[in-house]
Amino acid sequence: MKFDKPAGQNPVDRLLVVGHPHDRIDGKRKVTGTAPYAWEWHDEATKVAYGYIVTSAIAKGRITSLDTHNADNAPGVLAVVTAQNAGPLGKGEQNTATLLGGPEIEHYHQAIALVVAETFEQARAAASLVQVQYEQQAGEYDLAAAIPHATAPPEYEEDKTTGDFASAFAGAAITLDATYTTPDQSHMAMEPHASLAFWHGDQLTIRTSNQMIDWCRSDLAKTLK
């Protein structure tokens, strides 16, 4: 997403939302446990398999060994999908990493295997049996330390500046030069992190909860083409 021009007026500017009470459309259903979530469309897919993701234990490096033998032979397991047997996978424009890592690891917790089984519990149990060995590589994990030698992305122009900030700041009667930080924060969503996928002939339907629906659809199509 690129903002390179004024956004113009929006409902927040017109004060039609902020400062006024509004009922959530799905509020009552959520607090009473009747709101349908993405993975609950069982009327469209009555018999489903369950997938459980195995993620990378390192942030940067490569997989030297990925042993799925025990997982393959665990009760209820239908398949163990890795980069080695998944076939060609594309990469969407909005994704920063490939769908399945291997042998190269691009980030911590990158998906490196998907265990598919008849039940969720079987998939989860089998996922714990996947044995992975890594060759860890050095990386940069301190954002503040990396700032001095950071470079601007090539697709963006340099910031537009007006005046001489350094001189004005040095000559100001009162200055404030401080750094403020905040720890990582995670949204506590009520909806489980799960999606439902099913086929009607050659048409694939995905039921998922995603803020960027168009991006999700287009990138998924490019990944699976």
Where do the language-model regions lie?
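A broad structural signal for alpha-helix termini and local helix breaks/kinks
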Residues: 75, 224-225
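Non-catalytic, substrate/partner-engaging modules appended to enzymatic cores
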Residues: 153, 158-160, 181-182, 187
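Conserved beta-alpha junction segments in alpha/beta enzyme cores
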Residues: 35, 165-224
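Residue-level preference for nonpolar/small residues embedded in alpha-helices
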Residues: 63-64, 161, 212-213
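Flexible, low-hydrophobicity surface segments
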Residues: 1-157, 171, 175-178
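Predominantly extracellular/luminal regions of secreted and cell-surface proteins
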Residues: 80, 161-168
